[in-house]
Design a protein with these regions (language model features):
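N-terminal subdomain of nucleotide-sugar transferases
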Residues: 1-51
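Nucleotide-sugar-dependent glycosyltransferase catalytic domains
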Residues: 38-41, 45, 49-173
Length: 173
């Protein structure tokens, strides 16, 4: 079977898909990982077929404006900046995934890539699955969403999940 593994995110999001690709290849499947271009060497070093998405996530994550906002710890400004920066890539990434999807009988997507592949798989009648290795995400007042350094204040903790969700949607959808 020709399987496409579509994932977006950091190296930590990519590595589990490399392990999955190795296992699938060892069981006779033809596997291609579709992800950001800066992970090409990491993936091809394992003799896995690679299809690049044009965005270099590491380059975009370490721009001076992003680093400045992170240094100041203002997650609302960070959310706005991520939304603004990601808009220029999302349409192109969806088109790139759409083009390469013709080579797959089945697509397995990460949680961050799932919204991008869903309309493509439905349109082309390609079977798909979602595989998510991220930490659990349940809105609670007991502690803030990951990435938030707020003191443990219950109403702020709950708000942090809305901000986190907004950032995730703007960055990866």
């Amino acid at each position: 079977m020709r399987i496409g593994l579509v994932t977006k995110g950091s190296r930590g999001d990519i590595q589990p898909f490399i392990a999955l690709a190795i296992g699938l290849k060892n069981n006779g499947h033809q596997v291609t990982i579709v992800t950001f271009k800066n992970f090409q060497k990491l993936i091809t070093d394992y003799d896995i077929e690679f299809c690049p998405l044009s965005m270099d996530i590491e380059k975009e994550a370490y721009t001076e404006d992003v680093l400045e906002v992170l240094r100041k710890g203002n997650m609302i400004k960070f959310a706005r900046l991520i939304g603004k920066n990601s808009e220029k890539y999302n349409e192109k990434i969806i088109l790139e995934i759409d083009k390469v999807s013709e080579n797959f009988d089945f697509i397995i997507a990460s949680g961050l890539a799932f919204p991008n592949i869903l309309p493509i798989t439905v349109k082309k009648n390609i079977k798909y699955g979602i595989l998510n290795f991220s930490m659990p995400y349940s809105i609670t007042k007991e502690f803030p969403a990951m990435g938030f350094g707020f003191q443990n204040i219950s109403f702020i903790n709950k708000i942090s999940y809305s901000i986190f969700t907004y950032v995730a949607i703007k960055l990866f959808i």
